[in-house]
């Protein structure tokens, strides 16, 4: 399942996964009804990542084993509503991490962002382990998410994978 499937990355990821795994095996899920029509070639679920019980029921009942969690409030919008950004970005992640901890999900893919860095991070040849002082709500939530993913891996063996995306420019 790709949660947050209607966004820029989600749309392309769903199409690539359906090509690789088959249309019927990849569920596109999002809160919005106005997803790109190209996602209609396979299963679609209207899903609010903040509805913990609905997400849990869907994943367990459908036997979903891999989750790509892309649902998030991005930088500009997050700055306007920090409390909601934190809730959306963290509670959604906790829901999925807990499902994996409980044995319902085998793999989680959760993107982080270059936003975890800040003005004090070296700009050239940035090492993997370096100063991270994010200066945005989005960056703060992504940095916290990285730590939570690490915690769930170290303490519960949760298979969670992440990359830090650079700044992406919308294609629309």
Enumerate the language-model features and the residues they cover.
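Conserved glycine-rich Rossmann-like NAD(P)H-binding loop of the short-chain dehydrogenase/reductase
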Residues: 22-35
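Rossmann-fold cofactor-recognition segment
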Residues: 40-51
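Conserved beta-loop-beta element that borders a ligand/cofactor-binding pocket
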Residues: 113, 146-171
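Conserved Rossmann-fold NAD(P)-dependent oxidoreductase catalytic core, especially the SDR/UDP-sugar
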Residues: 94-137
């Amino acid at each position: 399942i790709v949660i947050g499937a209607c966004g820029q990355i989600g749309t392309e990821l769903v199409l690539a996964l359906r090509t690789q795994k088959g249309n019927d095996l990849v569920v596109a899920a999002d809160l919005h009804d106005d997803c790109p029509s190209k996602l209609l070639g396979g299963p679609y679920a209207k899903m609010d990542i903040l509805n913990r019980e609905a997400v849990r029921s869907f994943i367990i009942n459908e036997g979903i084993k891999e989750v790509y969690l892309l649902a998030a409030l991005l930088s500009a919008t997050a700055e306007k509503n920090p409390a909601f950004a934190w809730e959306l970005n963290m509670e959604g992640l906790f829901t999925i991490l807990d499902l994996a901890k409980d044995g319902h999900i085998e793999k989680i893919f959760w993107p982080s962002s270059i936003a975890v860095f800040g003005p004090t991070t070296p700009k050239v040849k940035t090492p993997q382990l370096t100063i991270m002082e994010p200066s945005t709500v989005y960056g703060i939530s992504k940095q916290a998410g990285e730590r939570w993913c690490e915690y769930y891996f170290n303490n519960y063996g949760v298979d969670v994978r992440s990359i830090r995306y650079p700044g992406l420019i919308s294609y629309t």
